[in-house]
Structure formats: structure tokens, C-alpha cells
């Protein structure tokens, strides 16, 4: 039996109401902060999916996106490093298609069937942009999902998968484009989305001897709410009872991540014995039949979709949204000098910077970050072991507010964090409202982008107010 053994999702804490984008807009969508991108969100989703698991058991990491920060540099290897996976594993980018996440899941199942791997982490993430004033601007949102695929302790069995392709230009973005493009919406939806989904779903269900009444929940990628309801009704589903809410009104369309996020949302409400039809779309379809097992009970309470949707803040205004997305540029502040990164130093300190390793004294147990050669408590020398701090929570010991350093993050909150496991680190706080910051508040770690210069994205860990109690 091969299937899903764990899952995790990440939806940015920030939302923007569509009314703020254009008068009359309904609902809201998720927005990545200025220091987030598809890679940082993939790390967060992956960390959530690995909670309680032995990370050395992961044999491969597949990262799917249409908005990778790097075009020539493997993004999956950076995610694997940040998530703290062992180095002798297969890492792969699955790029340039909205069904990259489901394609990666199919590849993972085939690798496991072939005996090339036992446990594979699949993560999908996107930060797509629609041009200002367009319908796509209202729909496109940010988020990430992650699934662990394996053959032991399976919570959701993957019974069957089929794939089709449909060669037509409907949604696209060329190499030099910042915004995704589309054209005649009626033609695109009828000849592209609806026909492809109907064909893939009917072929798969017929091959498995299933009818619509045999499906507990249909999880169908949706470019918008109306088209999803239309295609679900044509397949024969009761839209209100059998179809997963596409979350367009509260989340938006998260692109490559959408099929994984919607599946995770469905699994959070599923019970053993449920059968799920899972369909993604992008120049064709991937469709799968999934069966929920008793193992789903072991995954209750994970950081998934519902907890992320309940934890939210609102972007101040549309101008701030445009600045975060790099569409508008604000003048550099007087206290923010040009920044550079030393590639040699980054390579040398990658475990400290990317994996966020501290050191623990073998003599007295004192934890230090950054790692040191001499223990500050017992003064023993060179007797340390590594400890991962990226998945540790902590409390805010003290902080300062800087109102001039960074125009995109006013004020910059420099924080001193005491980890619950021991040790202390000085970190920048993000995703905050300055008036809500208090000594002793709970914080958690988040992988973020510090700056971009000379084609290099410089990443490090920050702290954020805890989104869970």
C-alpha cells in the first residue's frame, strides 16, 4: 500500500480584502509578506508535515512551483537544507505547470513502487501575480502544501492515478513576464478546464468501476468557484454535499499549491473509509482515487489548512500590497545601506544560517546560538553537539523597535528569544503588529528572505508571533 503518511500546509498570516483592490470585490485572499516567496513557504509547509517524524527517514524531496526564486539553481536542494534533511537524497524541482504538485506525487508513488525510495516529501508552493486591475489579480494568492508519501503507516491510500494533457494556450507566463496572462475566458474555461477535468475524471472513475455516488468527497482544482461547481455538477456530484470548498472567497487560487491545500483541507474533515476523487488542472489533468484509512486519526491536530485560515492579519492597504509584491518601489531608507552576501561565508556557515543549528554542551547541556567553541556556563572547550532550533518555540525576552532601517518593515523589531528547549538567539521578528508585541509572548521560527542582490536571494531564520496556542 502506497499513499500519504503525513501532511502539512502553510498559508501566510496576511490577507487583503478584495474590496481594497477594487470596489465591489467580495471576500479576501492570502498574501505572502515582503520577506516570503515560494521557497520560504515550501519550507514552512514541509516543516509542518515533518512534525513528529524522523527526518533521516526521508529519501527524496520534490519541490513543485511555477514561481521558483531561481531559474538556474536547484531550489529543492535549498528547501532540503532548510528542512534539515540528510544530504544523500534525491532532490528535484518540478517546474512550469500548475499540476506540478500532483505530478510530483505521481512521480513519488512510482519511485516507491520501483524500490528507489521509501519515504518522499512532496511540497508545492506558489506566489503568482495577476496584473493590477485584472481578474487574475483578485484570484491569485499565496500558499504552500506538503505531503509525505510512503508505504508504511499510510493514512490515505493512493489507489489509482491517471494523467492527460491538453495542448492549448489558456494561462501562461513567458520568461520575461512578471504577470500571468490569459485570454477569452469563456473559451479557455469550456475547452480547457471543463473538458479536461471531465475527461480525466470520467476515464479514471470508469476504469475503477466507480460512479459519482461512490465518492465521499471530490477535491477539484478550481480557477474560480463557478467553474468548479459547473464541472462537479456535470460529473454527477452533489455540489453542496460531495465537493470540497475551493476556498476561493477566503484564500484565493494558490496555483501549484492549490490541489495539495484543498486535499489537506478535505483530509482534516475526513474519516476512515472515505473515498476521494482528486483532480488538478494545468494544460491537462492529473486525477487520482484516494481511500482514507484508520491511520488518518494519527494526523489529527497537525498544522494544516484550518489553523492557518483562522490565524490572520490584514494588509494595511493596497499600496502596501503592491510594495510587498515589488510592483511599486519605495525609496531606500536613510538607515538601510546596500547589502551584499559573501558566498564563501554562506557556504562555510550554511548549517548555522540555513539549517539553524545551535550547539549544546556535552558537559552541562547549555545551548548556544551561534555555535561556540567554549561553553559560557562550564567553560568546557570543543565538547558540543549540534541541535536544530528551526522547529523550536520560544518566548520573547526583550526587543527594540527601529523606525528608520527598512521602509518595507516599519518598525523593524529586533528580538531576543529564549528557546523553550534552552538557549537564546537575537532574531528579527516578522508578521507582527508593533502594538501587540509583549515581553514573554510565544514565538516560533520561520525561514525568510533577508534581501536580494546581484541575483542572489539571501535567506535566514526570523521569529514570528506564534499562530497556535
Language model regions located:
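Condensing-enzyme catalytic core mediating Claisen C-C bond formation in acyl metabolism
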Residues: 1-38, 133-191, 195, 271, ...
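Claisen-condensing/thiolase-fold acyl-transfer catalytic domains that form or cleave C-C bonds
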Residues: 39, 43, 67-68, 86-88, ...
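Phosphate/pyrophosphate-binding loops at sites that engage ATP/ADP/AMP, CoA/4′-phosphopantetheine
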Residues: 45-59, 198-216, 235
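Cys/His-rich short segments
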Residues: 335-393
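Short, conserved beta-turn/loop elements at beta-strand boundaries and strand-helix junctions
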Residues: 399-405, 450
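Short aromatic-glycine-enriched beta-strand elements
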Residues: 404-416, 457-460
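Short nucleic-acid-contacting surface segments enriched for D/E, G, S/T with interspersed K/R
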Residues: 431-445
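OB-fold/S1-family single-stranded nucleic acid-binding modules
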Residues: 446-469
Amino acid at each position: 500500500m502506497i499513499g500519504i503518511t503525513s501532511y502539512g500546509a502553510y498559508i501566510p498570516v496576511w490577507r487583503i480584502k478584495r474590496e481594497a483592490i477594487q470596489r465591489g470585490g467580495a471576500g479576501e485572499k492570502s498574501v505572502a509578506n515582503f520577506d516570503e516567496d515560494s521557497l520560504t513557504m515550501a519550507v514552512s509547509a514541509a516543516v509542518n508535515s515533518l512534525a513528529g517524524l524522523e527526518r533521516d527517514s526521508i529519501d527524496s524531496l520534490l519541490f513543485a512551483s511555477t514561481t521558483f526564486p531561481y531559474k538556474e539553481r536547484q531550489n529543492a536542494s535549498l528547501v532540503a537544507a532548510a528542512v534539515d534533511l540528510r544530504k544523500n537524497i534525491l532532490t528535484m524541482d518540478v517546474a512550469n505547470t500548475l499540476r506540478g504538485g500532483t505530478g510530483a506525487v505521481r512521480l513519488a508513488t512510482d519511485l516507491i513502487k520501483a524500490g528507489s525510495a521509501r519515504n518522499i516529501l512532496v511540497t508545492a508552493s506558489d506566489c503568482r501575480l495577476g496584473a493590477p486591475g485584472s481578474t487574475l489579480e483578485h484570484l491569485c494568492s499565496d500558499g504552500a502544501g506538503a505531503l509525505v508519501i510512503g508505504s508504511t503507516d499510510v493514512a490515505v491510500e493512493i489507489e489509482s492515478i491517471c494523467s492527460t494533457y491538453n495542448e492549448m494556450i489558456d494561462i501562461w507566463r513567458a520568461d520575461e513576464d512578471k504577470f500571468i496572462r490569459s485570454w477569452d475566458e469563456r473559451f479557455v474555461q469550456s475547452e480547457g478546464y471543463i473538458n479536461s477535468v471531465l475527461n480525466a475524471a470520467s476515464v479514471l472513475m470508469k476504469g475503477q468501476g466507480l460512479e459519482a455516488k461512490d465518492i465521499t468527497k471530490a477535491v477539484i482544482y478550481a480557477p474560480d468557484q463557478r467553474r468548479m461547481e459547473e464541472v462537479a455538477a456535470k460529473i454527477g456530484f452533489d455540489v453542496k454535499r460531495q465537493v470540497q470548498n475551493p476556498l476561493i472567497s477566503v484564500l484565493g487560487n494558490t496555483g501549484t499549491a492549490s490541489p495539495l491545500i484543498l486535499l489537506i483541507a478535505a483530509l482534516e474533515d475526513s474519516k476512515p473509509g472515505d473515498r476521494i476523487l482528486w483532480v488538478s488542472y494545468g494544460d491537462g489533468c492529473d486525477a487520482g482515487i484516494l481511500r482514507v484509512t484508520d491511520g488518518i486519526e494519527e494526523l489529527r491536530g497537525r498544522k494544516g489548512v484550518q489553523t492557518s485560515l483562522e490565524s490572520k492579519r490584514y494588509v494595511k492597504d493596497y499600496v502596501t500590497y503592491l510594495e510587498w509584491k515589488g510592483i511599486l518601489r519605495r525609496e531606500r531608507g536613510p538607515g538601510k545601506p546596500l547589502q551584499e552576501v559573501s558566498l564563501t561565508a554562506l557556504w562555510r556557515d550554511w548549517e548555522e544560517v540555513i539549517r539553524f543549528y545551535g550547539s549544546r554542551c556535552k558537559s552541562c547541556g547549555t545551548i548556544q546560538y551561534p555555535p561556540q567553541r567554549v561553553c559560557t556556563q562550564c567553560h568546557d572547550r570543543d565538547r558540543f553537539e549540534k541541535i536544530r532550533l528551526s522547529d523550536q518555540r520560544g518566548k520573547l525576552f526583550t526587543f527594540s523597535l527601529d523606525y528608520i532601517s527598512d521602509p518595507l518593515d516599519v518598525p523593524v523589531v529586533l528580538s531576543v528569544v529564549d528557546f523553550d528547549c534552552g538557549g537564546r538567539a537575537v532574531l528579527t521578528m516578522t508578521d507582527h503588529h508593533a502594538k501587540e508585541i509583549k515581553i514573554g509572548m510565544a514565538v516560533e521560527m520561520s525561514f525568510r528572505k533577508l534581501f536580494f542582490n546581484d541575483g542572489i536571494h539571501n535567506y535566514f531564520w526570523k521569529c514570528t508571533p506564534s499562530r497556535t496556542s
